[in-house]
Amino acid sequence: MSSVDTAWLRMDSTTNLMMIVGVMVFDTPINVSRLKTLLEGRLLVYPRFRQYVHDDGLTAHWIDDDTFDMDAHLRRVRLPGAGGERELQAMVADLASERLDKGKPLWQMHLVENYKGGSALITRIHHCIADGIALIGVLLNMTDEDPNAPDTPRAVLGPAKSKVKKFSSDAPESTNIFSALGPLGEQLQNRFAPALQALAPMAGAAQQAFDQLGPLKAPLESALESAMGEGVRIGNAVVAKYNRWTDDPTEAVDTAKMVAGFAQELAYLATMPNDSQTRLKGKTGTVKCVAWSVPLDLTRVKDVGYVLGCSVNDVLLASVAGAIRSYLVSKGDAVADEALLRAFVPVNLRPKGKEYKLGNQFGLVGLELPIGEANPVARVFEVRRRMAALKSGYQAIVSMALLGVVGYLPKAVQRQALGLLSDKGSAVMTNVPGPAKPLYLAGSKIAQNMFWVPQ
């Protein structure tokens, strides 16, 4: 398991379960046998949905579940009473408060068979499996645009071949990072060769000491392999960057600016002040409350964005800021003009064409929502300005890198490090690009699709 995914695995707490909870609503009932067949042919092609996690305290691994039982992951349930929206929200809230079984693959679905004459599917997936962008890819792999399409099994799409020269951890001895870096690598090798030769006699002694570790040897070997894997990925990025430097020397200047930007963002994250104190800032609890609004017409949101020269995301975030302001005012709270509510917003860092890969490849940026701004138009412009500043910086990349480092730390240290971040904000706000056309799951049209992320 990657270090970032390990961090999400270990962030689990009794008051903040690291689950993505989703609800799909269907106008017509879903046949459970057909759904089960579809999941077996289109969901289980992703190995992580057939694997459980083994965490030895140092590293975490995906292990095939030889006793996998679909019935343990797909449950049939019925709502009490009228079987309406309130009853469905209560059921989703109960499930959002319930841990997934860590002895099994970390996902579960509940098929609600009596919701408003149709059905609903409640899905819980641990965040260590994948992020929102990857899960949209999973959803698209499971669904069809034609309600009469057969439930034919599908394979996971593979990666496109890269044209960038790479090195790998299993490359021949003659091919290493120095040779892969060309002339720059030759200079580095010449500079460090004496030191490497001096260290060579220590290798045998180190191996002997390593062999004496007994039961600790295997987990340490695994940790080192994971670290080497991260090193190879970083090395590949360095090689790609070096290739661009040789083609365009101005790339080196841009890289220097980027490194300075990284340092600046790291310093900001370390000293980031808490946001304004409001009734929304508090400690998470074990009992969750789930709700949703009447769906918004996306066309109207786009029209507003077009007129104001803003993105859909800008309009939605500004609307949420206005709703929070209205809520606080309705409760009699004073909202100062300079009041800010920081929301952590995920930013996708997954390379284009890599959507098929599961795991987490996103960073977080701290957006300070201008809840003190009473003018809705001015609020949209201010959100646009702040989002543009965040997008031009490196906060998302730095935050993902920090999560990767945290993933290698002992659990106790992880909790302290992550606790510092959670104190800096009051909310998490996210949206992911959904399908542009109506989709059908097991022949039933998806009328509504909603999800909630960890807090």
Residue ranges and their predicted role:
Residues 1-3, 12, 21-455:
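Soluble acyl-CoA-dependent acyltransferase catalytic core bearing the H(X)4D motif
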Residues 8-9:
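Basic/hydrophobic alpha-helical interface regions
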Residues 17-19:
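Short, surface-exposed loop/turn motifs at beta-strand boundaries within globular domains
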